[in-house]
Amino acid sequence: NTWSREVYAQLLSRLNAEEEAKPLVIGFDIVFSGQAQQEGDDAFAQAAAASGNVAAVSQFVYSEKPERDADGKRYYPVKDVVLPYEALRDAVQVGYSNVAQDSDGTVRRVIPEETWQGTTYAAFPKVVYDLYCERTGTEPNEIITDKYQRTLINYSGRPGDYEAISFIDVLDGKIDSRTFKDSIVLVGAYAPGMQDNFNVPNGRSSQMFGVEIHANILQAFMQNRFSINGNPYLFGAVYGLLCALLHWLFRKKKIWLSAIV
């Protein structure tokens, strides 16, 4: 965007106006890469450092040429990572905002952590979750992943279900700062045309904004609601055993499908 980053410093000032009513965590789903206006950049970084409860996003850049893993599965390797500008990076917790889309373009899974060039990066919702646990003294839940380091997203809400409040209304003082007491505030694009909306399994005909997807993932982390796809061979074996058992029970009790219809 073309705003001076000083507006984000002003937002933090509004949200943290009352110490006893400040949010637990404030997460920016906005890529603050590169230098903009020095004064605004410095103001935002200083406000974030003073807040001590701020997370921001990085973004992986993937190769356009796919490769194959050991199982022959096609994937696009990471070729670079875009980080927040240095002063902000030193003041906040950083997590990547990329979402994993299946071949049909639907976001069903999240990769909580990814390693590139020897460095492990955490996903934005996990960074926010870890910061929340740190600030509340809560032991983080163990995140169950499959062999590709993915976990299925258990969506709690459909597009538009999470409460959205206008950025400008907060800046203008139209929203009582106590509204955000002990909450997690995510700041991100919430309007069509900003190229941050995706197909989701429960979206029906509507797409979901990236910040809403992060909110759903975060809620799943907090509620310990993780799941992964089962082993298809194990599922087949169990299914076959179940069918055989039902067949034996039907014969033993002389129950036939024709008699049930």
Language model: regions and residue ranges:
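Non-transmembrane functional regions of envelope-associated proteins
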Residues: 1-146, 180-257
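Substrate-access "cap/lid" subdomains that shape
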Residues: 137-176
